[in-house]
Design a protein with these regions (language model features):
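Acidic, surface-exposed loops and disordered segments
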Residues: 1-165
Length: 165
């Protein structure tokens, strides 16, 4: 699948097959996250990949809109060093790279907000996350049980402005 196809076909999926993702594919997906742009090339990110069913269940119980995480093959929790003033932007870029790399492998995903959520502290403690890191996102990964249709999006004419607004 070429890059533009990946961008245009990506959909948020919340229903997954009970099928593991091979470790080498997970590593390659994370490597794509590692290659994301970051302000001043600081690369402030760390990625926790979770495949253990009990841990996935724990995260799904804590994450407000992530109840489906328990059924995912894996989830990735993206962290950034919080003293970096651009940690949110950098972590979001890494998150999107992971989602797009997964799609290129035929793996579906759903980005669950993690930043400044009430559940961040509990999940951080459970995963033994150092205190200098801030949760940016949780990404559920797995092979979809569905083929979601494209959702309605604003037209290009509604959002594109040439030269001035």
């Amino acid at each position: 699948m070429d890059a533009l196809e990946v961008l245009k076909q990506r959909r948020a999926v919340r229903s997954f097959e009970d099928k593991p993702i091979p470790k080498n594919i997970l590593e390659d997906i994370i490597d794509c996250g590692r290659l994301a742009p970051s302000a001043n090339n600081v690369q402030p990110w760390h990625f926790v990949v979770v495949t253990d069913k009990e841990t996935l269940k724990y995260i799904s119980e804590k994450a407000t809109y992530g109840k489906f995480i328990k059924d995912a093959a894996a989830c990735v929790v993206v962290y950034c060093e919080k003293e970096n003033i651009h940690h949110l932007e950098d972590g979001a870029a890494a998150t999107e790279n992971i989602i797009l790399a997964a799609k290129a492998y035929g793996i579906s995903s759903c980005w669950v907000a993690g930043y400044d959520r009430t559940y961040e502290k509990d999940i951080n403690e459970y995963l033994n996350v150092p205190s200098n890191l801030r949760m940016i996102s949780i990404i559920a990964l797995g092979y979809s049980t569905q083929n979601p249709s494209p959702r309605n999006k604003k037209s290009l004419n509604d959002v594109l402005h040439w030269e001035k607004f």
